[in-house]
């Protein structure tokens, strides 16, 4: 029957399980019209019915899918018998959609997530399917897939599909007219936030925001990670070598801390993120300097006034010069055990710092403390012992009593090599000299302490006349002092000019 020929007209293919057959050319005097049906090797005969539309045959029960061969036998009242040519009909009452695949699934295969705005679908159906169409709007509009050489049906969406979750409807129609519908949920995700990485404030040990740290295992906070991130990596580059480390979110936070100590130097960190859709994004690089130590190279007492390097000065405002690495930004000094500090000033040459004590420092021995702090917050402390000695006693020189041969204390002697006693010489004196002036000529003689006493005796006889002696003293701190001049007269002879009897 025409309505039951559900495929291509005349192909004798039907999706009806009880198809109706029209029997034609049956004479009016037919006494018996029988239909023989062969299916699966078994033949069953049924009586046709004659109604208003003529002779017809409809199975009394559903036929299963398969091929059926029908032949009609007509017997008229006179006993004549006639047979029709056999008719083979195929019953096909259903079709299936075997699979729907999102071809450009861009991340984990089978998660139906893509970062392509024009998704590509592959539909696998039985070979007798001749139409496959797809819709994203509940069947309001359809797109027809194309069969490939492999037999699968392909469809690439011709227009951009918006981000979000979508329901794909696929309808397959076979040549028997059967239809199958199946749906596939998929997600389009084409965007991924740009991550950021920052050095933890607690580890930014120098000036805030300078990304210099004295921590060997500094911590980094990572932000801008989307909830659908499937992989978060940190790439660390140091001395030309890069290392990639996978991160895991802990307690809702993304954080990175090296698993071993970093040596001093520069490190560049970049965060790379991939989401479930396969989108990728990376942060701007962050360069961090690890600086875990600093040193004080030298401390010099600039106005060391005695022997160079003995750290002794006669200046009550000692001047110190401190040499440190160029990244040091604070140098401070103390001579009271760190109770009070004075800040040094950096000179025009980086790494050289100077400090002049602003108030008088009394005589005595001191311990200078110097503290240097670099840009990373590292501290180095060093001490220097120094002495301030700004005083020197005034020496005295006297003619030995034994040689004061005239009136005691008149400093007139008849000794050609008179002796002189020198007092007021401090224990730290490093030079004691006697300057002798006679007839406009000066001679300076250095003395040595003997037996705990300072004494001077001319090395050769002095001729008669007047002599002026001055003692000059210098101590280790460079202080200089001299005695008041002592005038001595040498008179080794006398004469009787005449004798008169009065």
Predicted regions mapped to residue ranges:
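Flexible, low-complexity linkers/stalks enriched in Thr/Pro that connect modular domains
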Residues: 1, 76, 85-103, 180-200, ...
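Short strand-edge motifs at loop-to-beta-strand transitions and within beta-strands
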Residues: 53-57, 151-155, 252-256, 351-355, ...
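Structural beta-strand segments of beta-rich domains
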Residues: 17-21, 117-121, 216-220, 316-320, ...
């Amino acid at each position: 029957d025409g309505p039951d020929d559900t495929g291509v007209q005349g192909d004798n293919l039907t999706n009806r399980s009880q198809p109706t057959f029209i029997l034609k050319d049956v004479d009016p005097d037919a006494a018996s019209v029988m239909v023989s049906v062969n299916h699966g090797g078994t033949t069953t005969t049924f009586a046709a019915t004659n109604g208003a539309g003529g002779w017809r045959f409809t199975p009394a029960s559903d036929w299963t899918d398969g091929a059926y061969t029908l032949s009609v036998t007509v017997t008229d009242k006179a006993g004549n018998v006639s047979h029709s040519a056999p008719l083979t009909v195929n019953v096909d009452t259903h079709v299936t959609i075997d699979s729907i695949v999102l071809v450009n699934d861009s991340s984990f295969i089978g998660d139906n997530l893509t970062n392509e705005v024009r998704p590509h679908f592959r539909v696998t159906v039985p070979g007798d399917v001749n139409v496959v169409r797809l819709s994203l709007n509940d069947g309001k509009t359809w797109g027809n897939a194309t069969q490939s050489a492999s037999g699968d049906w392909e469809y690439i969406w011709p227009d951009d599909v918006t981000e979000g979750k979508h329901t794909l409807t696929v309808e397959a129609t076979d040549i028997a007219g059967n239809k199958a519908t199946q749906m596939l949920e998929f997600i389009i995700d084409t965007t991924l936030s740009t991550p950021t990485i920052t050095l933890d404030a607690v580890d930014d040990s120098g000036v805030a925001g300078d990304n210099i740290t004295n921590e060997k295992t500094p911590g980094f906070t990572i932000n801008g990670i989307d909830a659908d991130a499937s992989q978060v990596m940190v790439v660390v580059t140091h001395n030309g070598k890069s290392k990639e480390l996978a991160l895991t979110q802990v307690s809702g936070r993304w954080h990175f801390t090296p698993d071993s100590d970093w040596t001093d130097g520069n490190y560049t960190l970049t965060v790379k993120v991939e989401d479930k859709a396969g989108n990728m994004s990376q942060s701007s690089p962050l360069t961090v300097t690890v600086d875990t130590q600093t040193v004080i190279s030298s401390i010099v007492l600039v106005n060391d006034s005695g022997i160079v390097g003995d750290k002794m000065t006669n200046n009550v405002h000692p001047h110190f010069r401190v040499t440190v690495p160029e990244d040091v930004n604070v140098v401070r000094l103390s001579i009271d055990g760190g109770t009070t500090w004075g800040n040094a000033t950096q000179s025009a040459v980086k790494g050289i710092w100077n400090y002049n004590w602003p108030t008088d420092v009394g005589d005595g021995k001191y311990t200078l403390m110097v503290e240097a702090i670099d840009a990373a917050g590292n501290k180095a402390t060093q001490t220097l012992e120094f002495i301030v000695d700004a005083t020197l006693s005034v020496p005295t020189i006297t003619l030995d009593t034994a040689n004061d041969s005239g009136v005691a204390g008149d400093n007139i002697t008849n000794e050609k090599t008179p002796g002189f006693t020198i007092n007021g010489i401090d224990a730290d004196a490093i030079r004691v000299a006697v300057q002798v002036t006679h007839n406009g000529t000066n001679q300076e003689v250095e003395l040595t302490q003997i037996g705990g006493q300072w004494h001077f005796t001319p090395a050769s006889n002095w001729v008669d006349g007047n002599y002026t002696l001055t003692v000059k003293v210098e101590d280790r701190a460079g202080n200089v002092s001299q005695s008041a001049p002592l005038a001595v007269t040498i008179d080794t002879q006398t004469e009787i000019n005449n004798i008169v009897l009065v």
